[in-house]
């Protein structure tokens, strides 16, 4: 990745750095070690809890000591998926990135910007010497993608801040003040396969490195087959 052309430069510098560190969900030990080393190198108070959450504190700049303490939070794990024709071991291999026009992409794998860009933003702020701020606490939680176990394991007193800003969002310039939450549902049922009618229309959609549902909807819209599918109850098989 040529981070020199990406802005803010410090954010993308640290994003490139953490792309070199494997961080699958539930296997975050290498990125935890990286964060602890970062804290030591910058002379910042750093601690971890029993599940691996990391907290790095940065004192206020002179004259800002009386401001409320702000917590910045992001998760350090990433979704690890790759194209079938790509050789990649997420436990040892770095993420290879490439700038494609206005997009930063990974070569045949997930990029890990969720939530690596949040982690990189926090590291850039912690390393900065030209930003005025009150007391800061940067919280890095584990295992968001497969259960939120890091967030659920947080205990009173681990952080002391008054305001928490979560950096795991979609777009810049938007601030969420609440959410609908989430839930897990487990269902059990008896599955009995049946033969599909011979006069039905079948097709298979194969897409690499893209959102299959987004592409499928666009395909239906552009080929005008949505009304046909609705009228004739055609089967769709996802790969």
Q: Which residues does each PLM region occupy?
A:
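Buried hydrophobic packing segments
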Residues: 35, 39, 119-126, 154, ...
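Active-site metal-coordination/substrate-binding segment of hydrolases
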Residues: 64-140, 145, 151-162
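Midchain, well-structured core segments that form catalytic/ion-binding scaffolds
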Residues: 22, 94-96, 101-109, 144-147, ...
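Flexible, glycine/charged-enriched surface loops at secondary-structure junctions
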Residues: 47-49, 135, 237-239
């Amino acid at each position: 990745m040529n981070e020199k052309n990406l802005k803010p430069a410090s954010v993308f510098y640290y994003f490139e750095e953490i792309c070199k560190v494997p961080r699958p969900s539930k296997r975050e030990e290498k990125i935890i070690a990286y964060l602890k080393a970062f804290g030591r190198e910058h002379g910042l108070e750093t601690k971890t809890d029993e599940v691996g959450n990391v907290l790095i504190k940065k004192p206020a700049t002179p004259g800002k000591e009386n401001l409320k303490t702000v917590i910045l939070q992001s998760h350090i794990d990433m979704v690890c998926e790759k194209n079938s024709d790509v050789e990649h071991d997420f436990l040892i291999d770095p993420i290879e990135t490439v700038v494609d026009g206005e997009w930063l992409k990974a070569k045949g794998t997930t990029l890990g910007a969720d939530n690596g860009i949040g982690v990189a933003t926090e590291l850039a702020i912690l390393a900065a010497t030209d930003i005025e701020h009150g007391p800061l606490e940067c919280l890095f939680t584990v295992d968001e993608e497969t259960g939120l176990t890091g967030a659920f394991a947080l205990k009173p007193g681990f952080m002391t801040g008054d305001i928490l800003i979560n950096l795991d969002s979609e777009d810049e310039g938007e601030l969420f003040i609440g959410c609908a939450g989430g839930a897990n549902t487990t269902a059990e049922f008896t599955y009995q396969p049946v033969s599909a009618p011979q006069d039905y229309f079948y097709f298979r959609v194969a897409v690499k490195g893209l959102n299959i549902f987004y592409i499928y909807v666009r395909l239906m819209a552009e080929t005008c087959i949505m009304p046909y599918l609705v009228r004739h109850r055609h089967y769709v098989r996802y790969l």
